[in-house]
Amino acid sequence: NNHDLIQNDEVDDFILSEKIISSVLAQIAENKKLADVFRELFVPEGSEIYLKPITNYVNVNKKINFYELVESAKLKKEIAIGYRLEMYSRISSNKINNKLANFGIILNPYKNDYVDFSEEDSLIVLSEN
């Protein structure tokens, strides 16, 4: 399965699986207005998901909450949707039971929680090419 491929080959990208496609279709079935959002994400000329250096957005010498990252991304006409903590990037959920164990990827984090980011961490954003 995809999870095993990621672990064995140390793949450092997102994989679009049947589970994600099923989730998208279920969301559109419940709310037709979401179709436009997903269309923007999935057409070649639409916005894309990028992992960009956290240092492009904030100074990492202090604790930062996600709200600050959202505002910083907004100034660049991007939408912050999460972040990746590099120190957890090689840890899968099979190895430990922890929210940070998803290869360091945190999507839709609590905006008021403060995090100590390192220079190696990334912000996950929606942005036009």
Language model features: what each stretch is:
Residues 1-129:
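Cytosolic regulatory regions of ion transport systems
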